[in-house]
Design a protein with these regions (language model features):
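N-terminal, motif-rich segments that launch catalysis or mediate targeting to/interaction with membranes
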Residues: 4-149, 153, 164-274, 278-309
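Sequence/structural segment immediately N-terminal to covalent heme-attachment motifs in c-type
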Residues: 1
Length: 309
């Protein structure tokens, strides 16, 4: 759906949110950075593709072959890899053929990617608040620039997750058994991502904004023993979009995602843009609210001040 549309996420933030984010320069910077992770695809180097590509999707259906459920997934990326490796050995699963990037049959890392980028934003807010009281003007400016960077990168993956095709093995046309006759076009993903609006008219930003609520604190699991960041809220968000995969294909099959009869398709995609905007705003807000002062940096800057006196 195009991260660089960049959405209406700032509409959800309170007036007390750091104001430097709202300058024209930083608004444009965030919009530009929202497309940055896709620009990392401009190389054909397999090592970078292997690293970057799985962060953009989470094909929920692939969990079944590993006998894994979303309720039991580790919040930690590499522990999740171990869960899959254990299942592959136990179930004697063979590696897919033609697997040049070593990614076929892999569900992807999108929930972990979003959560990790969220936590990096928490970190950026943590040291920004210390620099604001104890740092130099140059340090404050640099810390603010890092917050803007983290906000932009995080927003990309959240918008990816709002596009239902980023949550399914049917990410670019229906695959496998297809009794309902859904499209198998390899252009379907790009059509939903932006081709649909380019062929009709731009999204109605006012209609998107009407669907937004003020950013709010996200619910935490009852037990925090295994909790990490906002992983559970992110999984819930992704699963909600995954439930819309077949309705999206149904819209296409009935011609309602076409330039000739676009109204229902427009409503659907704008609703997803609103969902992405809401989640981005919520995660930005939570990162700011939850960021503790960077105690290590406080001690370092206090020692620096003593040496200067």
């Amino acid at each position: 759906m195009g991260s660089e549309m960049c959405i209406r996420d700032r509409e959800t933030l309170p007036q007390s949110f750091p104001r430097f984010v709202f300058t024209a320069e930083n608004r444009e910077r965030i919009r530009f950075l929202a497309g940055e992770p896709d620009r990392w695809r401009n190389t054909r180097d397999r090592a970078l593709r292997h690293l970057n590509n799985p962060d953009h999707y989470f094909d929920v259906e692939y969990l079944a072959q590993y006998e894994l459920k979303t309720e039991t997934l580790s919040h930690f990326r590499y522990r999740f890899v171990e869960q899959m490796a254990d299942a592959r050995a136990r179930l004697k699963l063979e590696l897919p053929e033609g697997n040049t990037d070593h990614l076929k049959g892999h569900p992807g890392f999108m929930p972990w990617s979003i959560n990790e980028h969220y936590l990096k934003l928490v970190s950026s807010f943590s040291y920004l608040q210390v620099f604001k009281t104890m740092g130099t003007p140059e340090e404050i400016t640099n810390a603010q620039a890092n917050v803007v960077y983290r906000m932009g990168i995080l927003s990309h993956f959240v918008v990816d997750a709002a596009q239902p095709l980023h949550t399914t093995e049917h990410f670019n046309g229906w695959t496998g058994e297809n009794p309902k006759g859904y499209t198998t076009s390899r252009r379907f993903h790009s059509w939903v991502d932006g081709g649909f609006f380019r062929s009709t008219t731009d999204p109605n930003r006012a209609a998107i904004t009407k669907q937004l609520n003020p950013a709010a604190l996200l619910m935490r699991p009852a037990s925090r023993d295994l909790a990490s960041g906002q992983f559970q809220a992110i999984i819930d968000y992704i699963l909600k979009q995954h439930r819309l995969v077949e309705p999206l294909y149904q819209l296409d099959k009935t011609g309602k995602l076409s330039k000739e009869t676009p109204d229902a398709g427009r409503e659907f995609v704008q609703k997803q843009l609103a969902a992405g905007s809401q989640m981005i705003g919520d995660l930005w807000f939570n990162a700011w609210k939850e960021a503790p002062p960077d105690r290590f940096l406080q001690r370092y800057l206090a020692q620096r001040k003593l040496k200067e006196e």
